[in-house]
Regions:
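Leloir-type glycosyltransferase catalytic cores
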Residues: 1-24, 144-224
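Short loop/turn segments at strand-loop or loop-helix junctions that form parts
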Residues: 27-39, 72-73, 136
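Short, solvent-exposed loop/turn segments at secondary-structure junctions
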Residues: 39-41, 78-79
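Mid-to-C-terminal functional-domain signal that highlights helix-capping/loop sites
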Residues: 40-55
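Short secondary-structure boundary/capping segments
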Residues: 46-49, 84-87, 129-131, 146-150
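Catalytic donor nucleotide-activated moiety binding site of glycosyltransferases and closely related
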Residues: 56-99
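A donor-sugar binding/catalytic signature common to diverse glycosyltransferases
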Residues: 100-145
Length: 224
């Protein structure tokens, strides 16, 4: 339902896709997802590569001749958070810089997604795209992604050392989107199942969040 309704975490309007495929669509198209470099998921979930420049360099070197599409994080583009790459490096490493572009449309337009720990990697998995992780996001280490960085051993082995079964994508989605979260319907203002949230997001518009929720969101951004 999430994929069919085209609902994502980034459920906002965005600019049209930049011009791609100048050298012909026969080129493999690789999406490289930039992040906020002081975000907790980057600080705690990466080791060998923990910068956007490092990620872009590794991805570009792994795909000589491919079309490298770099998606900067919106907060980095706005100058609010660290993680900017100098224009000279972008010009040398990326074929296209997809500023303010729709993340879902970018995923659909590309053949493969490279990330450190971004949730866009999970969005790409939902849509059947190969994902390469240089960090250890929650969706890495289960056999669903190609992991170039270390992932916690607890995702592969039980405390007694025995290997753990590998979940398929359906089981991961159930754990992440159904079993773990609790959902709140902004219309009825009551707890609700995930299906209701998908309908609300897909068909909107939604009520304006209260001042309390807006303040909580700001605090979450500060401490994330």
């Amino acid at each position: 339902a999430v994929v069919k309704a085209r609902v994502t975490k980034y459920n906002l309007g965005a600019a049209a896709l930049p011009k791609m495929g100048a050298n012909g669509r026969s080129l493999r198209r690789v999406l490289v997802v930039g992040q906020v470099e002081d975000d907790a998921s980057v600080r705690l979930g990466t080791s060998t590569v923990s910068t956007n420049l490092g990620l872009l360099t590794v991805a570009a070197n792994a795909h000589p001749g491919a079309e490298i599409i770099y998606k900067p994080h919106p907060d980095v583009e706005a100058g609010l958070r660290p993680g900017a790459i100098v224009p000279e490096d972008l010009q040398n490493l990326a074929s296209v810089v997809a500023s303010h572009a729709d993340p879902l449309a970018l995923i659909e337009a590309c053949d493969e997604v490279w990330t450190m720990t971004s949730l866009l990697g999970f969005e790409a998995l939902l849509r059947g795209k190969p994902v390469v992780c240089l960090g250890a996001p929650f969706y890495a280490g289960w056999g669903l992604t190609r992991d170039l960085g270390p992932v916690p051993d607890r995702r592969r082995r039980a405390p007694d050392g025995h290997p753990l079964p590998r979940p398929d994508l359906i089981h991961l989605v159930h754990a992440v989107l159904i079993s773990y979260p609790r959902y709140f319907d902004p219309v009825s203002r009551r707890p609700c199942p995930p299906e209701v949230v998908v309908v609300r997001l897909a068909h909107g518009p939604l009520p304006v969040p209260s001042l309390r929720l807006r303040l909580l969101a700001k605090l979450q951004g500060i401490f994330a």
